[in-house]
């Protein structure tokens, strides 16, 4: 008998679980109300905002994980976050005005600043690349004699 005072209570199910999200829907709703962004906040607004934030976080973390793997590291550091965000066109536009602490800069050298190759050096390099492309002939027992 589930009366007023005694009995078994149902286990509370959070809105995050109902929506299938990891980000806290209740906390985001509280922040929306407390921040006075509007007089009233709809019930779907914090769910939608939590989903958007979770998607963005997952996207950035995936790209940062790839950047860490490219650098043969197992831990994501701010440098990997910066490389992930700045090398992605859409995220780079979204976070254009954001500074990531200890992120460094994107490696870039203007082509005007690079040393110019002399025609002789360029020709010599082209010949060496052609020679490297050819595979050397193996000496067999018949050719050694």
From Swiss-Prot:
Residue numbers spanned by region Disordered: 118-145
Q: Which GO terms describe its biological process?
A: heterochromatin formation
Segments of skewed composition (Basic residues) = 135-145
Q: Which Cys residues form disulphide pairs?
A: none
Tissue specificity, in the record's words, reads: Abundant in meristematic tissues.
What Pfam families has UniProt attached to this entry? Histone, Histone_H2A_C
Q: Which GO terms describe its cellular component?
A: nucleosome; nucleus
Residues spanned by motif SPKK motif: 135-138
Supply the InterPro entries for this chain.
Answer: Histone-fold, Histone_H2A, Histone_H2A/H2B/H3, Histone_H2A_C, Histone_H2A_CS
Q: What keywords tag this UniProt record? A: Chromosome, DNA-binding, Nucleosome core, Nucleus
Question: What is its subcellular localisation?
Answer: Nucleus; Chromosome
MF terms in GO: DNA binding; protein heterodimerization activity; structural constituent of chromatin
Q: What is its main location?
A: nucleus
Q: Does the keyword Nucleus apply?
A: yes
Domain remarks in the Swiss-Prot or TrEMBL record: Contains one SPKK motif which may interact with the minor groove of A/T-rich DNA sites. Phosphorylation of this motif may regulate DNA binding. This motif is reiterated in both termini of histone H1 and in the N-terminus of sea urchin histones H2B, but its presence in the C-terminus seems to be unique to plant H2A.
How this chain assembles, per its entry, is:
The nucleosome is a histone octamer containing two molecules each of H2A, H2B, H3 and H4 assembled in one H3-H4 heterotetramer and two H2A-H2B heterodimers. The octamer wraps approximately 147 bp of DNA.
State the family it belongs to.
Belongs to the histone H2A family.
Report the function annotation for this chain. Answer: Core component of nucleosome. Nucleosomes wrap and compact DNA into chromatin, limiting DNA accessibility to the cellular machineries which require DNA as a template. Histones thereby play a central role in transcription regulation, DNA repair, DNA replication and chromosomal stability. DNA accessibility is regulated via a complex set of post-translational modifications of histones, also called histone code, and nucleosome remodeling.
Q: Which PANTHER family match?
A: HISTONE H2A
List the protein's name: Protein H2A.5
Q: What species was this sequence derived from? A: Triticum aestivum
